[in-house]
A protein has these predicted regions:
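Alpha-helical substrate-recognition element adjacent to the catalytic core
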Residues: 2-84
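Mg2+-dependent phosphoryl-transfer enzymes with acidic/Ser/Thr/Gly-rich catalytic loops
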Residues: 34, 71-72, 77-78, 86-171
Length: 171
């Protein structure tokens, strides 16, 4: 894989299931879905948000706990139940004055393909499906739900000299 230029990135957008989770969905005794997320991913998400990056989730799934978890990390741009991720991306770009080259979108499966082709830096976890890996400019060494989100955020912040700043020491 060629050297990746993370310097223009101002925006991180993620799918949720399979990126921030390992893709496993548990159900409680009433049938409500439960998903596990990674604390190290959470640390990186809250730091990026605190440092002023745009951080968003665009997910096809409807899961109220996704919104609660992301909001607890300072991520307020959480869009769930989105059937057309490209349309939502275009709306988000227009509302925030963003250009494709500023954006990383990390996805893991077929529903993410089209939206990933609309950003400057398509990315995926190590365990993404082959079709997603084929179009990704960055493939994390970490699988979904096991540090892939942290990996990509950390790489961007390091390139932009924002990784070990004073803000990094407080959560």
């Amino acid at each position: 894989m060629n050297e990746i230029d993370f310097s223009p990135i101002t925006t991180f957008i993620f799918d949720f299931d399979g990126v921030m989770t390992d893709g496993t969905v548990f159900c409680d005794f009433e049938g409500h879905p439960l998903r596990a997320t990674n604390v190290k991913d959470g640390y990186a998400l809250q730091l990026a948000s605190k440092l002023g990056y745009h951080v968003a989730v665009i997910s096809g799934a409807v899961c109220p706990s996704t919104i609660v978890r992301m909001n607890s990390l300072g991520v307020t741009d959480v869009f769930t139940g989105i059937p057309d991720k490209v349309l939502k991306l275009n709306e988000y770009m227009q509302e925030n004055g963003l250009k494709p080259e500023e954006i990383i979108f990390m996805g893991d499966d077929i529903p993410d393909l089209h939206v990933m082709q609309c950003v400057g830096l398509p990315a995926c976890p190590a365990d993404a499906v082959p079709e997603v890996k084929a179009i990704s400019k960055f493939v994390s060494e970490c699988p979904g739900g096991k540090g892939a989100v942290r990996d990509v955020i950390e790489r961007v912040l390091k390139v932009q000299d924002k990784w070990m700043t004073a803000e990094a020491y407080a959560w």
